[in-house]
């Protein structure tokens, strides 16, 4: 079966799959960040340290586990909500923390595949940016994501969607790297 046939079959499967719509805060666990300033992050940063601390946009610091209180270290695959400035979602599946004005979600529900939710939220970033743009400094609050309803198809459907989107993401990265190398 060629890629176009697979894509048509996937679209058909999604359109006919039973879907429940539930608020994000009802189906995922929201976690808090750590109290840290940009200056402290810069001071603590060590190249190749094992723990990533996320801040707004593309800003992060690599630190040692001892640098952050254990209660603020998240070890589950998660969606990090970058809630100020550039509003976006990031998926991360290694131990991490983030600044306390941000939050993250992970799943303890065996019927929810966190990476599926991440891919869905990526398609909704403009919605959240529009909410955030009403402020002088763009930002959203936890109720904005907690109360946001997401479609929840069967776990099997979620896994198929993620498998296909992971392939597309990988192909896109390969294509970008190839184009950059040629230029």
Regions found by a protein language model. Give the residues of each.
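Non-catalytic DNA-recognition/assembly elements of restriction-modification systems
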Residues: 13-36, 47-58
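Short secondary-structure junctions
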Residues: 127-130
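A short beta-sheet element
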Residues: 58-122, 134, 141
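Amphipathic alpha-helical segments
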Residues: 1-4, 16-20, 146-183
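Primarily mature extracellular domains of secreted and cell-surface proteins
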Residues: 29, 135-136
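Short, recurring structural edge motifs at helix starts
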Residues: 9-14, 38-43, 124, 136-137, ...
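DNA polymerase processivity clamps
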Residues: 36-45, 66-69
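Extended macromolecule-engaging scaffold surfaces
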Residues: 2-9, 28, 32-40, 52, ...
């Amino acid at each position: 079966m060629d890629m176009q046939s697979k894509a048509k079959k996937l679209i058909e499967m999604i359109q006919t799959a039973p879907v429940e719509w539930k608020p994000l805060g009802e189906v995922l666990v929201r976690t808090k960040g750590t109290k840290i300033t940009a200056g402290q992050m810069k001071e603590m940063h060590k190249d190749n340290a094992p723990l990533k601390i996320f801040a707004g946009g593309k800003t992060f610091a690599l630190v040692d586990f001892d640098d952050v209180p254990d209660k603020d270290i998240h070890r589950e695959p998660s969606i990090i909500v970058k809630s100020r400035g550039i509003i976006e979602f990031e998926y991360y599946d290694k131990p991490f923390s983030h600044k306390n004005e941000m939050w993250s979600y992970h799943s303890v529900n065996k019927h929810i595949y966190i990476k599926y939710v991440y891919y869905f939220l990526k398609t909704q970033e403009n919605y959240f940016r529009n909410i955030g743009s009403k402020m002088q400094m763009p930002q959203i609050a936890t109720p904005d994501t907690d109360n946001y309803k997401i479609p929840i198809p069967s776990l099997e459907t979620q896994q198929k969607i993620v498998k296909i989107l992971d392939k597309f993401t990988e192909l896109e990265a390969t294509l970008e790297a190839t184009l950059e190398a040629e230029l």
